[in-house]
Amino acid sequence: MVAIPDFLPALPEMFLACAAMALLMLGVFRGADSTRLVSWLAVGAALVAGVLVLAASGDRAVTFAGMFIADDFAVFAKVLILTATALTVVLSVNYLEREQMDRFEYPVLMLLATVGMMLMVSANDLISLYVGLELQSLSLYVIAAFRRDYAKSSEAGLKYFLLGSLSSCILLYGASLIYGFSGTTNFERLAVMFSSDVPAATGVVVGLVFVAAGLAFKISAVPFHMWTPDVYEGAPTSVTAFFAVAPKVAALALFVRVLVDPFGELLAQWQQVVWFSAVASMLLGSLAAIQQRNIKRMMAYSSIGHIGYALVGLAAGTEEGVRGVLIYLAIYLAMNVGTFAVILSMRVNGRMVENIDDLSGLSRSHPMMALAMAFFMFSLGGVPPMAGFFGKLYVFMAAIEAQLYVLAVIGVLTSVISLFYYLRIVKVMWFDDLMETIERPARASALVIGGTALFVFPVFYVFSEGILNGAAAAASTLFLR
């Protein structure tokens, strides 16, 4: 029997799940006109859950028969996830109304997906890992196809569902191999088993490769990236904004925990897999984005490249590498949320526009929005003194300390190549002639754009010490054993 105190480490997840169900009931009783109210209450629920998460920081607790762990690593990842959810729901409110998609189920599904993500980063067992992953995925499948009257949205949802189901099968097969050859699915028992002098069975290594492949799909790492451009382009733009941040943060944090915590002693076996995926992701992301004219497809390939940079830190397999990954994720969140806030504001005569050329002359009609977008592009490209430069600096330094010199050099070269398509957007905004005037962004979107733009340049230096210390504390918890 589970004692009452055992539920306390999972209090944020329980609160958010109850809030989602309460908001679902509220939407049912109030009807279709409740979307705005439910959305803002969902933002409030995410913020309260964030406070509950931070209140438990510094403590380490394992509960639910070893299935769930609450530690500083989970706290850091959950704060990022909840921040991403709150910001993307804020951006969605006006978009849903303008696109006639305002249904109260939308923010509820986002909250349920967030609960799944929080369970993922606190998973201490392959079974709880899968449960959290599927809770997230089932919600995301629905919101990817949320715009039922738009063929591309239905196509995006179907593609994501089919390929996501395949990746789940691959992950389950890998988990079954690990259990079959080790006799356990618990992370702590696996870590103890592999810390002995007895070499790991070949079946365990093969199972780990399958699990890594299943998780690589969730983070859009090459060669499991094929769904990303089509889903990013076809899904409603507010959904794409959510996909670009929260699920990526959760899946990559889970990827780090799985490889470093139970399988840290098998670094020699999984390091080469991560090395290849990092190189392939950086190369594909930087080269394929060059020819894109649709800004959402460009951001899809950009996200693939950025996952490659984050994997550089993971490939190091060190505490410094994990710290670099977490710092990178925090900066990546701000850059992408800000960029998609601008994309969501791209309206001409009431209709959404998605081509890069539609930003022509933006500096003349909306100079502050153009300046913010330039900040995001410079930061995504890793140009100093933007925050994105320091994100890449920490992962590359970790790779060099781990003697992965080739990986670091490839990362620097692909980062230089990626500047082409980021600077192209800056050139279009500031030097091309004004074609059509983009409408003024909604107040909520303008606040998000301004806040994230300030974060990626001046404000980052103010909070950098807190982010660095939080990431260091989170990374150290994975190396306690």
UniProtKB/Swiss-Prot annotation:
Q: Which UniProt keywords apply?
A: Cell inner membrane, Cell membrane, Membrane, NAD, Quinone, Translocase, Transmembrane, Transmembrane helix, Transport, Ubiquinone
- GO molecular-function terms, A-Z: NADH dehydrogenase (ubiquinone) activity; NADH:ubiquinone reductase (non-electrogenic) activity; quinone binding
What does the record give as EC number?
A: 7.1.1.-
**Signal sequence: where?**
none
| InterPro entries from the UniProt entry | NADH-Q_OxRdtase_suN/2 (IPR010096), ND/Mrp_TM (IPR001750)
Q: Which cysteines are joined by disulfide bonds?
A: none
Write down any Gene Ontology CC term: plasma membrane
Give TM segment ranges: 9-29, 37-57, 73-93, 104-124, 126-146, 161-181, 204-224, 236-256, 270-290, 298-318, 324-344, 370-390, 404-426, 447-467
The answer on whether this UniProt entry bears the keyword Translocase reads yes
- Keyword check for Hydrolase, yes or no: no
Q: Which cellular compartments is it found in?
A: Cell inner membrane
Record's bilayer topology term: Multi-pass membrane protein
GO biological process terms on file? ATP synthesis coupled electron transport
Q: What is its main location?
A: membrane
Its UniProt entry gives the catalysed reaction(s) as:
a quinone + NADH + 5 H(+)(in) = a quinol + NAD(+) + 4 H(+)(out)
User: What is its biological role?
Assistant: NDH-1 shuttles electrons from NADH, via FMN and iron-sulfur (Fe-S) centers, to quinones in the respiratory chain. The immediate electron acceptor for the enzyme in this species is believed to be ubiquinone. Couples the redox reaction to proton translocation (for every two electrons transferred, four hydrogen ions are translocated across the cytoplasmic membrane), and thus conserves the redox energy in a proton gradient.
* Subunit structure of this chain's protein: NDH-1 is composed of 14 different subunits. Subunits NuoA, H, J, K, L, M, N constitute the membrane sector of the complex.
Q: Belongs to which family? A: Belongs to the complex I subunit 2 family.
The name on file for this protein is NADH-quinone oxidoreductase subunit N
Name of the encoding gene = nuoN
